[in-house]
Amino acid sequence: MMPINNRTVVRTLIATTNAFDIDATLALFSPDAVIHDVSVGKRFIGHAGISDYLKLYFVDYHTQSRLLSAKFKDQGQAQIRVDFTGNFGHEIGLLLLSFDANRRIVHIDADLE
């Protein structure tokens, strides 16, 4: 079994959101994680809030993501740039992910270019 690291978490996040697999995506987050999405002006808190976010902005818009770049600042953070396409057209997303010691996502700051 391949050891889990932040790169694996990022790749898995892209794959599970592209598959619209909300349960598998939520498994990557700590129970009290937060997504702060500046582009929509809201914070989504905990698994319930993140589930709502995924349903609304990924499932309902048929969003597909492609990783453009990733910088891993240390064991606790990653900055990624993602190409989003879906029913809304096309956008480039900028995400700053923070991880806990168990490699679960605890916070995402999200915005669009």
Describe the role of every protein-language-model region.
Residues 9, 21, 53-54, 93:
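Hydrophobic alpha-helical segments typical of transmembrane helices
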Residues 1-8, 43-48, 103:
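Short charge-dense sequence patches
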Residues 1-19, 23, 27:
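Short, low-complexity N-terminal intrinsically disordered segments enriched in polar/charged residues
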Residues 13, 25-26, 33, 46, ...:
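Hydrophobic pocket/interface hotspot
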Residues 18, 33, 86-88:
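Flexible interhelical turns and helix-capping residues at alpha-helix boundaries
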Residues 51, 58-113:
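A beta-strand edge to alpha-helix "cap/lid" segment located at domain peripheries
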Residues 22-23, 31-68:
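A solvent-exposed, acidic/Ser-Thr-rich amphipathic alpha-helical stretch
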